[in-house]
């Protein structure tokens, strides 16, 4: 099957020149930008010896060099995607001297005019200044990753925030539980008055099914659940993987219900409201959005070429939409064992990330609607996008030999959060039922393998149907074009048909 190509025309404005934010393979991106060369690829080419044969084929050394150049350029495209055909140069020039001068002047102003009487405010202002300068450095030095819309600086700042979050987790890992709680109290003193109610009962009176009770469960968190799954579908774009994650998350809730009481749910809440309504409709809507974006024609005009003010405003708003969108294929009938295992690993890592959310909230006693909890969810959701893109290229493109920087940092964040939970939740994990954990891991692996295998099998069947259709058509064409049986048509019609 051929990949559908959606990008039509070459973007000409600074905003338009931004590259494909889809999860298409790095090979497609390389073909779209043949003029861009990585550091290795832009080096002067060493003359290679040619064979004496008339074909003039390149020597094996030249072939190896070409292969290395392809590998280097593939990683550059997925790790720091360039922006071509820029027409508004001002927004894409570095401006490093100006940025340095403005940053230093701003810090000097606030350092001299602010009131320094309050020690807590001094500490908070110092931390904000550290974050500010770190993000400035990230804009200048960090890679923007595989995305460039609305601007590469946005993704560099996001990457800088992820590195700061990772460093914060490393700092918290070397503190004891009371110290960490004191830090949270310093950030928000209201947390002193909040405690997890371990005596509260969940999942009671499951036989009482009424419309009022069902409507009571459809609160703001249910809408968040639905939108979260729609966002996951846009990120992963594979029905089988999404349903594997959905089903296994319900199994995860059952397994860890003895540690997290809020995981206890009635059967109709877990099966109907969660799996079918929230998860199912969210997956359907997310994949539908992807389908619409794949079918859309992407033809960008420079903002300089637009004469009307309304058109310029509309074009500026469209800068926050993808430059193009391509269908992706996590699995195909010829997938290797390593690719098979990589997709299973993606499913399991997704479960760990979801578990970290609930364990962090439970161990450090925060309400579900607290700004730290909400902020972390939004940050993780944004940072997962380039990470999944880089992981997809690493899994599917044989020329990509190492994982992207954002994906590496995300993996470190996921593991650090899990370590922080285990270290500070000793009392909670002492009640862990080992048999439940062993069964959970076993079921995770079995269901992951089963869903991935079914996805490959389904792909094989679809390809067989597509390949068998032309053969059947060829067989039926001669039969339909042959002379009709005698006595059914007049000689004039037979002659016309012949």
Swiss-Prot record:
Sorted alphabetically, the Gene Ontology BP terms of this entry are: phosphatidylserine biosynthetic process
Please indicate the ranges of residues that lie on the Lumenal side. 114-122, 175-239, 288-339, 389-402, 458-498
Under which pathway is this protein filed?
A: Phospholipid metabolism; phosphatidylserine biosynthesis
**What is catalysed by this protein?**
a 1,2-diacyl-sn-glycero-3-phosphoethanolamine + L-serine = a 1,2-diacyl-sn-glycero-3-phospho-L-serine + ethanolamine
What is the scientific name of the source organism? Drosophila melanogaster
Name the chain's protein.
Phosphatidylserine synthase
The biased composition feature labelled Polar residues covers: 7-25
Entry-linked InterPro entries: PSS
What is the recorded membrane topology of this protein?
Answer: Multi-pass membrane protein
Name the family.
Answer: Belongs to the phosphatidyl serine synthase family.
């Amino acid at each position: 099957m051929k990949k559908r190509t959606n990008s039509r025309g070459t973007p000409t404005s600074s905003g338009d020149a931004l590259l494909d934010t889809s999860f298409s393979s790095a090979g497609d991106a390389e073909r779209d930008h043949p003029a861009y060369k990585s550091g290795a690829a832009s080096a002067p080419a060493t003359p290679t010896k040619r064979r004496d044969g008339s074909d003039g084929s390149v020597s094996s050394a030249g072939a190896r060099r070409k292969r290395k150049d392809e590998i280097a350029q593939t990683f550059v495209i997925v790790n720091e995607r360039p922006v071509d055909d820029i027409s508004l140069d001002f927004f894409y020039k570095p401006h490093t001297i100006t940025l340095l001068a403005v940053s230093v002047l701003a810090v000097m102003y606030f350092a001299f005019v602010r009131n320094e009487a309050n020690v807590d405010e001094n500490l908070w202002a110092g931390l904000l200044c550290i974050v500010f300068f770190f993000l400035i450095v990230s804009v200048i030095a960090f890679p923007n990753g595989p995305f460039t819309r609305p601007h590469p600086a946005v993704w560099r700042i996001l990457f800088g925030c992820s590195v700061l979050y990772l460093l914060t987790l490393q700092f918290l890992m070397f503190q004891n539980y009371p110290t960490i709680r004191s830090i949270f109290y310093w950030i928000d003193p209201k947390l002193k008055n909040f405690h997890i109610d371990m005596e509260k009962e969940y999942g009671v009176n499951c036989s009482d099914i009424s419309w009022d009770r069902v409507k009571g469960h459809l609160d703001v968190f249910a809408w968040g659940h639905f939108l979260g799954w729609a966002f996951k579908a846009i990120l992963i774009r594979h029905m089988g993987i999404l349903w594997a994650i959905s089903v296994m998350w319900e199994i995860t809730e059952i397994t860890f219900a003895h540690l997290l009481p809020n995981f206890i749910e009635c059967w109709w809440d877990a099966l109907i409201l969660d799996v079918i309504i929230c998860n199912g409709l969210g997956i359907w809507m997310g994949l539908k959005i992807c389908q619409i974006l794949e079918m859309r024609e992407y033809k960008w005009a420079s903002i300089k070429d637009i004469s009307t003010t309304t058109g310029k405003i509309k074009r500026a708003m469209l800068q926050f939409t993808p430059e193009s969108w391509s269908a992706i294929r996590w699995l195909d009938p010829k997938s290797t064992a390593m690719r098979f295992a990589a997709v299973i690993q993606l499913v399991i890592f997704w479960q760990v990330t979801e578990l970290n959310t609930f364990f962090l909230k439970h161990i450090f006693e925060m309400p579900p609607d607290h700004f730290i909890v909400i902020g972390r969810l939004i940050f993780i959701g944004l940072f997962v996008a380039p990470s999944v893109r880089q992981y997809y290229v690493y899994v599917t493109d044989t020329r990509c030999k190492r994982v992207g920087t954002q994906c590496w940092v995300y993996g470190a964040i996921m593991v650090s959060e899990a370590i922080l939970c285990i270290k500070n939740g000793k009392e909670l994990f002492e009640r862990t039922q080992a048999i439940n954990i062993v069964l959970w891991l076993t079921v995770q692996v079995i269901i992951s393998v089963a869903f991935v295998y079914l996805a490959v099998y389904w792909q094989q069947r679809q390809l067989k149907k597509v390949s068998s259709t032309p053969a059947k058509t060829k067989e039926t064409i001669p039969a339909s074009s042959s002379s009709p049986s005698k006595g059914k048509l007049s000689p004039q019609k037979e002659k016309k048909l012949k």
